[in-house]
UniProtKB/Swiss-Prot annotation:
<dbReference type="InterPro" id="IPR036754">
    <property type="entry name" value="YbaK/aa-tRNA-synt-asso_dom_sf"/>
</dbReference>
<dbReference type="GO" id="GO:0002161">
    <property type="term" value="F:aminoacyl-tRNA deacylase activity"/>
</dbReference>
<comment type="subunit">
    <text>Homodimer.</text>
</comment>
<dbReference type="InterPro" id="IPR006195">
    <property type="entry name" value="aa-tRNA-synth_II"/>
</dbReference>
<keyword id="KW-0963">Cytoplasm</keyword>
<dbReference type="InterPro" id="IPR033730">
    <property type="entry name" value="ProRS_core_prok"/>
</dbReference>
<comment type="function">
    <text>Catalyzes the attachment of proline to tRNA(Pro) in a two-step reaction: proline is first activated by ATP to form Pro-AMP and then transferred to the acceptor end of tRNA(Pro). As ProRS can inadvertently accommodate and process non-cognate amino acids such as alanine and cysteine, to avoid such errors it has two additional distinct editing activities against alanine. One activity is designated as 'pretransfer' editing and involves the tRNA(Pro)-independent hydrolysis of activated Ala-AMP.</text>
</comment>
<dbReference type="InterPro" id="IPR004500">
    <property type="entry name" value="Pro-tRNA-synth_IIa_bac-type"/>
</dbReference>
<keyword id="KW-0648">Protein biosynthesis</keyword>
<dbReference type="InterPro" id="IPR002314">
    <property type="entry name" value="aa-tRNA-synt_IIb"/>
</dbReference>
<dbReference type="InterPro" id="IPR045864">
    <property type="entry name" value="aa-tRNA-synth_II/BPL/LPL"/>
</dbReference>
<dbReference type="InterPro" id="IPR002316">
    <property type="entry name" value="Pro-tRNA-ligase_IIa"/>
</dbReference>
<dbReference type="Pfam" id="PF04073">
    <property type="entry name" value="tRNA_edit"/>
</dbReference>
<protein>
    <recommendedName>
        <fullName>Proline--tRNA ligase</fullName>
        <ecNumber>6.1.1.15</ecNumber>
    </recommendedName>
</protein>
<dbReference type="Pfam" id="PF00587">
    <property type="entry name" value="tRNA-synt_2b"/>
</dbReference>
<dbReference type="GO" id="GO:0006433">
    <property type="term" value="P:prolyl-tRNA aminoacylation"/>
</dbReference>
<dbReference type="InterPro" id="IPR004154">
    <property type="entry name" value="Anticodon-bd"/>
</dbReference>
Length: 568
């Protein structure tokens, strides 16, 4: 491809609203153009990258035995009403009416549609298992679209759905999809981790996320360097350190702590470690009032709390309810002498001589101990976020925390949708059974941004070779002034094309600095510079995008050498 025949629309500066480096670089490199809030046009350069990612995904999905189809983007409301999600999915679902006043939505996901296909077409166990997938544009009405294509309203997704006669078959395909996803992300050239995750709004019984590791990631991931353990911080088990609770070292005393409400403020005021303080959070569930206890330096994990059956619908208590129950405003709550049911985190049981609220405004209690000053908590659960240094749940070391960008998610849905929509089959004995189901998603357009978050420098993008828009750029210095430069550049260009190399010849009448800057910005991994001086010695200059210095190649061997480099 010649630049003169291509649409290269680079910018020197990114628009002010671009926050993430990937958003800034995608706009500057001309990969995307903004149409409206959360809406982007994929320009020719960006589309080449998308197509390469889609090609890798299709190859690996097809190799796994999955079958590609394409479902409508617009769904009738009746399907979503069958599962109950029409009313509960939330404002992210964009709902519309046709001219006949019939309700539809732009599909944010396709469980209902694929189950409708399965219940119509699959009748016998002989047709199972089967795995369908599509690559399609989806729409979610994000309340605050941001970060470019990372959180856009319209995005491209690969979603797959499998149907099974039993759980064993589902688990086999689930493992196969995990392996397939690992191959996809490895081929793309991403550094990633597969982590155990919460099923969220999709539901089901098992779930794993695939995260591209990046400091800008929205999600926190807990992992153990000494093993394969990894989990989203929402799900990672906080294992107690196993330290026996010490005997009391002091007498409980009430201390004035004026205007000190947070554990950190109290710790600073009293000159004690914050981990020696205890926080009490007031919540309600099922109309009942509870106190949740955590160590002062730990954070509540709401996902874990909601998994406790009697706290599934918990809410933080209103101040009026707190005062009615505790005769004390928030900020000074504690577990001593209260009637409320006490739910404690595991780490609380290891505490002794701790400081907590005195249930009196402006006061805290110090040197508080279980068994002496108050009974043990009514119930104990894991209700906190893990912190770096916690024991790994697999017993093989300690946990570290990194940031990640979610690019894939797999679920064991079981019968969550198939039962509600009556997707059944006849088993070997002629009995009617409900199909087991799995679903598997990849954020195709999000991968482009995630890859950039991992691969960039001060000059621009450094795409992995497998998804770079072009493998090689040829920059002829003096193309419009020197016949020799033009001739040799054209020869090398044609030789590279014949060798199957995706090459971009910069035949613009531009300064070399502009051409170099554009090539580095858009992330082409290899570059050949042709100039009169080097041609006199039969040489051209080669430099990889990550190389600090260029090297000279023989003009006669340049095409074959580049072909080998690009093939590695």
């Amino acid at each position: 491809m010649r630049v003169s025949q291509f649409f290269l629309a680079t910018l020197k500066e990114a628009p002010a609203e671009a926050e993430l480096i990937s958003h800034r670089l995608m706009l500057r490199a001309g990969l995307i153009k903004r149409l409206g809030s959360g809406l982007y046009t994929w320009m020719p350069l960006g589309l080449r990258i998308l197509h390469k990612i889609e090609h890798i995904i299709r190859e690996e999905m097809n190799n796994s035995g999955a079958l590609e189809l394409l479902m409508p983007a617009v769904h009738p409301a009746e399907l979503w009403q069958e599962t109950g999600r029409w009313d509960v999915f939330g404002p992210q679902m964009l709902k519309i009416q046709d001219r006949h006043k019939h309700d539809f939505c732009f599909g944010p996901t396709h469980e209902e549609v694929i189950v409708d296909i399965a219940r119509r077409e699959i009748k016998s166990y002989r047709q199972l298992p089967i795995n369908f997938y599509q690559i399609q544009t989806k729409f979610r009405d994000e309340i605050r679209p941001r970060f470019g294509v990372m959180r856009a309203r319209e995005f491209i997704m690969k979603d797959a759905y499998s149907f099974h006669a039993d759980v064993d078959s589902l688990e086999q395909t689930y493992r196969l999809m995990q392996e397939t996803y690992s191959r996809i992300f490895t081929r793309i050239g991403l550094k990633f981790r597969a982590v155990a995750a919460d099923t969220g709004a999709i539901g089901g019984s098992g779930s794993h996320e695939f995260h591209v590791l990046a400091d800008s990631g929205e999600d926190a991931i807990a992992f153990c360097p000494a093993s394969d353990y990894a989990a989203n911080i929402e799900l990672a088990e906080a294992v107690p350190h196993g330290i026996p609770r010490k005997e009391p070292a002091g007498i409980m005393a009430k201390i004035a702590t004026p205007d000190r409400k947070s554990c950190q403020d109290v710790a600073d005021f009293l000159g004690i470690p914050v981990e020696q303080t205890l926080k009490a959070l007031a919540v309600t569930a099922g109309g009942k009032f509870y106190l949740l206890l955590l160590r002062g330096d730990h954070q509540l994990n709401e996902t874990k709390v909601r998994k406790i059956p009697f706290l599934g619908d918990f809410e933080f208590a209103e101040e009026s309810r707190i005062i009615a129950e505790m005769s004390c405003p928030p900020g000074y709550l504690g577990p001593v002498g209260v009637k409320a049911e006490i739910i404690a985190d595991r780490a609380v049981l290891e505490m002794s001589d701790f400081t907590c609220g005195a249930n009196e405004e402006g006061f805290h209690l110090s040197h508080v101990n279980f068994g002496r000053d108050l009974p043990l908590p009514d119930q104990v659960f894991d209700i906190r976020n893990i912190v770096a240094g916690d024991p790994s749940p697999d017993g093989k070391g300690v946990l570290e925390i990194c940031r990640g960008i979610e690019v894939g998610h797999v679920f064991q849905l079981r019968t969550k949708y198939s039962e509600k929509m009556k997707a059944t089959y006849l088993d070997e004995s002629g009995q009617t059974r409900i199909m087991e189901m799995g679903c598997y998603g990849i954020g195709v357009s999000r991968i482009v941004a995630a890859a950039i978050e991992q691969n960039y420098d001060e000059r621009g993008i450094i795409f992995p070779q497998t998804i770079a828009p072009f493998q090689l750029s040829i920059i002829p210095v003096g193309y419009h002034k020197s016949q020799q430069v033009r001739t040799e550049a054209e020869k090398l260009y044609q030789a590279c094309r014949s060798a199957g190399i995706e090459v971009l010849l910069d035949d613009r009448e531009e300064r070399p600095g502009v051409m170099f800057a554009d090539q580095e910005l858009i992330g082409i991994p290899h570059r050949i510079v042709i100039g009169e001086r080097n041609l006199r010695e039969g040489m051209v200059e080669y430099q990889g995008r990550l190389d600090k210095t260029p090297q000279m190649l023989s003009l006669s061997e340049a095409a074959s050498i580049i072909s080998k480099i690009c093939g590695d």
